[in-house]
Each structure stands twice: as structure tokens, then as C-alpha cells.
From Swiss-Prot:
Residues 204-215 have a biased composition (Basic residues). The gene is sox1b. It comes from Danio rerio. InterPro entries: HMG_box_dom, HMG_box_dom_sf, SOX_fam, SRY-related_HMG-box_TF-like. This is Transcription factor Sox-1b. GO terms for molecular function: DNA-binding transcription activator activity, RNA polymerase II-specific; RNA polymerase II cis-regulatory region sequence-specific DNA binding. Signal peptide: none annotated. Keywords: Activator, Developmental protein, DNA-binding, Nucleus, Transcription, Transcription regulation. It is found in: Nucleus. It comes from the Eukaryota. Residues 1-35, 198-219 are annotated as: Disordered.
Length: 340
């Protein structure tokens, strides 16, 4: 293609008679669409015609763009006296072009809108990612609240809190302090209400959402595994769903979070628990059988003062230890989950 361009430039008497479509213009003086009127050559083009062919013969493997770069650099280094004959030739060609095409008007090609399209696609992708990742962000914030709440009951029982933290992957020194736990509880209650409003009673949706967003932090993964996921597999259903007959620390934490979050959420999770049989590994009695009074006290510690006196909240608090104690007898004699 480049050799054809060079040959047509060299063998044509005037630039306006070229049939090359490198520089397009309107069909003002030509009968055929291919014979378009080109702009008259400037001084550099007049000079570079012979130089381009000479350089191409000396370096046959050199690309035409590299030849143009070298010719441009060489043209800049030339003096005005050396450029004068080529400038005069360019003026003559321009005058000839104006005589042959008096109504010629240069209309440059419109710039392609590829950049605008790219910006539009990137903006749409960002919006999709933002809308899809909203649930993950909420779950991540909720996971931080779970981690802080897991470490808060150290004063009530060190072995119980240590077993909760060990089963969920947090170390004992990761989150400490009642103040941080209370603040996290308030934030997690809002996030849980938002999540339940978007996906009521659907734990499997959170499960698929987690796989579509692998960039979520690891604590969020643990929170989903213990609180929000639901799997139809019978051997892992109690661990992945919110079954109260699973791990002691997990079920206790889940009921605590559900009672604080919303009454509708615990109702939906309770329906999931009752509809599916569960198989869970045996857990030591001291790690999953806290006193019901201590349980209600620890749950009510995170409730606001306005909700503490609410009869619906009190009924949920009474229902939690009963539901928890009734499920402790169905755990013994089962196979532990060795694949987790």
C-alpha cells in the first residue's frame, strides 16, 4: 500500500489528479467517487517525495511511519535557503490547484467518536459494578460488626468467646472493647435491615452475589458462611444456613444478630430452619449451652433503650434461648464436617 502511495506521488504530474483516498474531500470536480480532489502538497510533501523513495530503497524493511519520522526531523534541521525551492514549488502547485478547482473547500474528516464510546462504556460498567457491589459493601460492614460482637462477651466467659472467635476465624485480639462492639452493632443493624429489604428471605441470593464479587474481604465471606448462606446439601446445611442446631457459637451469634436486626429477618431464617433437616458436628457442651438469662442479658446489652422495652423485642428475646436450648439435644452422634 505504501509503495503504491509513493509510486502515485512520484509518477503523477499534480497532486490533485491522484486517485489515492488517503485524504478525502468532496466530489466537487470529479465524476467518479474514487477520483476525489486532494489538497495541494505543501513544501514538506514536495521535498519528501524524492527523499521517501530514496530512504525506502536504502532501508527496504523500514516501516513508512518510521521513514516519516526521520524525514520530519531532517526537514526541521534544514535552513530556509534549502527549503526555498520546495516552498516555491508548493506555491505553484497551490495556484494551479485553485485554477483547476476554484470552488474547492477543504473539509477535514470528522474525528471518530471512539473515545466517547469508550467513556460511555466505562461509565456504564462502573454503574453496573457499583449497583452489583452494593450488597457486598453492606455485607462487609456487617461482617466487621460480627467480628466485634464475637469478641465482646469475653467478660462473661472466656472459653465461650474464644470458641466463637476460633470457629469464625478471628483472633482474640482482633476486635476488643465494648464501645466498638456497640457502635458496630448499630451499624450492622442498619445494614441487615437494608439487606433484608432488598432480598427478603433469600440466603441463596447472597451466596451467588458473593461469588460474583470475589474482591470482597475475607471477613465478609465468613459472615455469609455463618449467617446468610443457604445450601440444599444435607451434610453442610446446618453450617451454611442459619440453623440453630449447628455450631454453638455460630447459632448463638446468628440469633443474636437476627434479634437485633429485624423481626422479619428472624422469621424468615426460622422458616428455613424448620423446613430442612440438619446434620451438624458435635460441639462441647460448655461452648454451646450458655444460661438463658445471660443470653438475654447479652442480647439486650446491644439494644437501644427505646427498643429494650418493646414487647415484640422481649418476645424475641424469650424465644431465642428456648429455640436454642431445644436444638441442643439433636446434635450428638453426628459426623463432623471435615471438608471445611
Amino acid at each position: 500500500m505504501y509503495s503504491m502511495m509513493m509510486e502515485t506521488d512520484l509518477h503523477s504530474p499534480g497532486a490533485q489528479t491522484n486517485t489515492n483516498t488517503g485524504h478525502t474531500g468532496p466530489n466537487s470536480g470529479s465524476k467518479v467517487n474514487q477520483d476525489r480532489v486532494k489538497r495541494p502538497m505543501n513544501a514538506f510533501m514536495v521535498w519528501s517525495r524524492g527523499q521517501r523513495r530514496k530512504m525506502a530503497q536504502e532501508n527496504p524493511k523500514m516501516h513508512n511511519s518510521e521513514i516519516s519520522k526521520r524525514l520530519g526531523a531532517e526537514w526541521k534541521l534544514m535552513s530556509e535557503a534549502e527549503k526555498r525551492p520546495f516552498i516555491d514549488e508548493a506555491k505553484r502547485l497551490r495556484a494551479m490547484h485553485m485554477k483547476e478547482h476554484p470552488d474547492y473547500k477543504y473539509r477535514p474528516r470528522r474525528k471518530t467518536k471512539t473515545l466517547l464510546k469508550k467513556d460511555k462504556y466505562s461509565l456504564a460498567g462502573g454503574l453496573l459494578a457499583g449497583s452489583g457491589g452494593g450488597g457486598g459493601v453492606g455485607l462487609g460492614m456487617g461482617a466487621a460488626g460480627v467480628g466485634q460482637r464475637l469478641e465482646s462477651p469475653v467478660g462473661h466467659g472466656g472459653s465461650t468467646a474464644a470458641s466463637y472467635a476460633h470457629m469464625n476465624g478471628w483472633t482474640n485480639g482482633a476486635y476488643s472493647g465494648q464501645v466498638a462492639a456497640a457502635a458496630a452493632a448499630a451499624a450492622m443493624m442498619q445494614e441487615a435491615q437494608l439487606a433484608y429489604g432488598q432480598h427478603p428471605g433469600s440466603g441463596a441470593h447472597h451466596h451467588h452475589g458473593h461469588h460474583h464479587h470475589p474482591h470482597n474481604p475475607q471477613p465478609m465471606h465468613r459472615y455469609e458462611m455463618t449467617a446468610l448462606q443457604y445450601s440444599p446439601l444435607s451434610n453442610s446445611q446446618s453450617y451454611m444456613s442459619a440453623s440453630p442446631s449447628g455450631y454453638g457459637g455460630i447459632s448463638y451469634t446468628q440469633h443474636q444478630n437476627s434479634s437485633v436486626a429485624s423481626s422479619g429477618a428472624i422469621g424468615a431464617l426460622g422458616s428455613l430452619v424448620k423446613s430442612e433437616p440438619s446434620v451438624s458436628p458435635p460441639v462441647n457442651a460448655h461452648s454451646r449451652a450458655p444460661c438463658s438469662g445471660d443470653l438475654r442479658e447479652m442480647i439486650s446489652m446491644y439494644l437501644p433503650t427505646a427498643e429494650a422495652g418493646d414487647p415484640s423485642v422481649q418476645s424475641r428475646l424469650h424465644a431465642v434461648p428456648q429455640h436454642y436450648q431445644s436444638s441442643t439435644t439433636s446434635v450428638n452422634g453426628t459426623v463432623p464436617l471435615t471438608h471445611i
